[in-house]
Amino acid sequence: NHVDGIEKGGELWIKGPNIMQGYIMPDNPGVLVPLEGGWYHTGDVVEIDEIGFVYIRDRIKRFAKIGGEMVSLNAVDEMVRKAYEWMGGEFDYGVVAVPHESKGEQIVLVTNNRHVEQDVLHSYIRNNGMSELFLPRIILFRDKLPVFATGKADNVTLKKEVLEELSAKNSVAA
């Protein structure tokens, strides 16, 4: 299915006897809410090649909608990694989208590396023909970022923490 702002691919919908029948909602226990037309919306952005292989490229929820354009937060993650490859070593960072008054959303980069600078990221974007939309508008520094026991980034907790921090800063500025 087409996803606004995604040029190649779309959202994967699946249907079949092995797919769940629907959802049981907490506000109406015991009542099954069937899937629309029997189709399950996976939330995965996929591309299908010329011979029919399906490639999962991203998650719909890992996008920022900035001024009507969809920006992949995974692509921003990758851009940050590549922009700082020259430093060697590992550092932690996460990218989240938060509300923006006029543009819909904005990208926030959170890292434990105090050498990460917007100028370096901006140069990387410019030198690699990327859109300015990929540039994080805010960079926050933390000693530790939230992760699951597996070591994978906990983006839900990170976004919550970022929203709390930005809200506190706006309260002080007001």
Give the positions of each predicted feature:
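Short, small/polar residue-rich loop motifs at catalytic or cofactor-binding pockets
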Residues: L35, Y40-T42, L140-F141
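Conserved ATP/PPi-binding loop(s) of AMP-dependent carboxylate-activating enzymes
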Residues: N1-V33, E69-V71
